[in-house]
Amino acid sequence: MMIKQYLQVTKPGIIFGNLISVIGGFLLAAKGQIDYALFLATLLGVSLVVASGCVFNNYIDRDIDRKMERTKNRVLVKGLISPKVSLVYATVLGIAGFALLYLAANPLAMWLAVMGFVVYVGVYSLYMKRKSVYGTLIGSLSGAAPPVIGYCAVSDGFDTGALILLLIFSLWQMPHSYAIAIFRFKDYQAASIPVLPVKRGISVTKHHITLYIIGFMVATLMLTLSGYAGYKYLIVAASVSVWWLGMALQGYKSANDDKVWARKLFIFSIVAINSLSVMMSVDFMVPSANNLLTYLG
């Protein structure tokens, strides 16, 4: 029973979602030349770091989790694991993850993990989430770290491809998170968390969602235009982006139930990002040695 609780507090769903993006970044950089030992070490290292961050987040959010319907039954809220033990557990997970990335991958991968961790735990969870409407924006940077870590574990350098991945996943996080904040509006309001829908209203949030999806669309296409991914990826990226944008625009119809609309937008956001992760894993080369930007220039 205790094993289940120690697993639950690491938020396995979040770990799994992050691993899909790590795989996408790793295989994009590997271009078919896969070092399986490095691959497994990177997946395990990132899993441990993400798990650590989630446990720290659960520890920090104990007070507000009690006020939210979605989180009131979490392990630490119910006292199934003591706060002191959770801190030790989170620390051990983090140290193990950072050490594995440093020793089995490279220092860059580890430092990217450290930066993502510090932003999520130190900046977002401890301060921005509770104090600022821009908390989601800051948190999006940590959410974009896993695919970049996967990419840099192979490349051992932060190049244009890594930057594009950072942009894609950061921009994706915003509509994804805002959609959650809309259909969980009462939860965030009850916990006094200053997310955009609560502070500025759902109407303003819809405009932000639309703009971020347009930005996401441009960023996804850049992966092919810059010569990192192929045309099959491009077709899928364009298709899911246009469809997601269309769903966002549906939110402006007055007859729509905002919560139902936001939940659908949230679900499709997961489909969209996983589709891109899969496609960049398998379609990592363009047919020509030159990329499209060369021709456009």
Curated annotation (Swiss-Prot):
Give the principal location in a single coarse category. membrane
The family database entries (Pfam families) matched by this protein are listed as:
UbiA
Localization: Cell inner membrane
Give me the reactions it catalyses: heme b + (2E,6E)-farnesyl diphosphate + H2O = Fe(II)-heme o + diphosphate
| UniProt-listed Enzyme Commission number(s) | 2.5.1.141
Listed GO biological process terms: heme O biosynthetic process
In the bilayer, the protein is annotated as:
Multi-pass membrane protein
- MF terms (GO), sorted A to Z: protoheme IX farnesyltransferase activity
Recorded hits in InterPro entries, A to Z, give: Protohaem_IX_farnesylTrfase (IPR006369), UbiA_prenyltransferase (IPR000537), UbiA_prenylTrfase_CS (IPR030470), UbiA_sf (IPR044878)
Any further remark recorded for this protein: Carbon 2 of the heme B porphyrin ring is defined according to the Fischer nomenclature.
The family assignment reads:
Belongs to the UbiA prenyltransferase family. Protoheme IX farnesyltransferase subfamily.
Q: What does this protein do?
A: Converts heme B (protoheme IX) to heme O by substitution of the vinyl group on carbon 2 of heme B porphyrin ring with a hydroxyethyl farnesyl side group.
Q: Which HAMAP family match?
A: CyoE_CtaB (MF_00154)
The protein, known as: Protoheme IX farnesyltransferase
Q: Which organism is it from?
A: Sodalis glossinidius (strain morsitans)
Taxonomic lineage: Bacteria, Pseudomonadati, Pseudomonadota, Gammaproteobacteria, Enterobacterales
**Gene symbol of the encoding locus:** cyoE
